[in-house]
Amino acid sequence: MFVKTGDKVRVIAGKDKGKEGTITKTVAGKDRVVVEGVNIVKKHQKPSNEYPQGGVIDIEAPIHVSNVQLLDPSTNEPTKVAFKIEDGKKVRVSKKSGNVLG
């Protein structure tokens, strides 16, 4: 997967198209990511220790990784990601600016 937890991304497709946020969780087996403040859905929660009241709560649901594009940290513009081998390690590189991504 070309994105990691903590990356800033922009949603490029779907109901939240154009929104930006930080990736809070990745679901690798299904190629999905949870982006902060994006794809908010209502969930009917049974009472539990965490939610003693229960009821309807808003949560961030995962979206497919193909619907997000990484933002280049130096220019804050959407960019594609390339992979290079540097000093024997595989690193992510921004195709737009050529900078190594954290």
UniProtKB/Swiss-Prot annotation:
Output the CDD domains linked to this UniProt entry: KOW_RPL26 (cd06089)
Q: Print the keywords alphabetically.
A: Ribonucleoprotein, Ribosomal protein, RNA-binding, rRNA-binding
Say which domain of life the source belongs to. Answer: Bacteria
* Any single GO BP term: translation
Q: Which InterPro entries match?
A: KOW, Rib_uL2_dom2, Ribosomal_uL24, Ribosomal_uL24_CS, Ribosomal_uL24_KOW, Translation_prot_SH3-like_sf
Query: Which Pfam families does UniProt cross-reference here?
Result: KOW, ribosomal_L24
TM region positions: none
MF terms (GO), sorted A to Z: rRNA binding; structural constituent of ribosome
Q: Which GO terms describe its cellular component?
A: ribonucleoprotein complex; ribosome
Annotated family: Belongs to the universal ribosomal protein uL24 family.
Q: What does this protein do?
A: One of two assembly initiator proteins, it binds directly to the 5'-end of the 23S rRNA, where it nucleates assembly of the 50S subunit. One of the proteins that surrounds the polypeptide exit tunnel on the outside of the subunit.
Give the PANTHER family listed for this entry.
MITOCHONDRIAL RIBOSOMAL PROTEIN L24
Assembly, per entry? Part of the 50S ribosomal subunit.
What protein does this entry describe? Large ribosomal subunit protein uL24
* Organism the protein comes from: Leuconostoc citreum (strain KM20)
Ranked from the top, the taxonomy reads: Bacteria, Bacillati, Bacillota, Bacilli, Lactobacillales
